[in-house]
Amino acid sequence: MDATYWGRNFGVLLIVDAYRKRLLWRKFLDKKETIADYLEGIEWLREHKFKILGIVCDGLWGLPQALAQYKVQYCQFHQVKAVGEYLTKNPQTDAGKELQRIAHLLCHTDKESFTGMLEMWYEKWGEWLKHRTLDRKTGKKSYTHQRVRSAYFSMKRHMKWLWTWYDYPDTPIPNTNNILEAINTDLKTKLRIHNGMSKRYRKLFIDEYFRLKYK
C-alpha cells in the first residue's frame, strides 16, 4: 500500500494485492496521508473478510508500529531512495560513498550479508559520526556529518522491517512496493496528457482508469 500525489492537495492512497495485481481499495486524499487513512483501508479489508498475509509499506512515521499485529515489510526500494536523498548522488566523504554502496546492495543480497556490512561500516565510522561542529554565531554544536548520520540511522531504525520477507520464507511477501510504483507511474503518465484537468474530472479519470484496468 502506498499513496501518490499531484501537488500538495490531491492524491490517492492505494491498497493492491501484490500477487494477483488487483486493486483492493483506494481513497482520494486532500492532504498528506495519515496513519488513520491506512488503518481505514486495513479495516475495510478486515470487514470484507480478506486474509492479510503481510503488508508492504513505505516510511510514514509510526506506520509499521501501528500495524504491529501484521507481518510488515518496509519497502526496500523506498529505503534505498531515502538514503540517496540524504547522501545525494555524489557523496563528498569516504564514509558516505561506502554507505551508499552498501545501501545499493539492499535489494540484491540477504539479511546476514547486509547487516554484517552495515555493522562493519559502523565499526569503522561510528566515532566519526559523533563529530560535532561549533556554530560561532549561536554557540551551539551540531553533528558535523548530519546527512551521513541520517542515512545510517534511517536504515538502522527500519532494520526490523526491512527483512520481513526474508524472515518468513513461507509467507509470500514482496520486498518492495514496485507493483504499486508501476501503477502510479502509468497513471501519472496518462494524466499528464490531460494536464490542467480539474480535481473533479481528475477523480473521474482515476476511477475509470482503475475500473478498466484493475477490475
PLM segments and residue spans:
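Conserved beta-strand -> loop -> alpha-helix junction used to position metal-binding or nucleic-acid-contacting
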Residues: G54-Q100
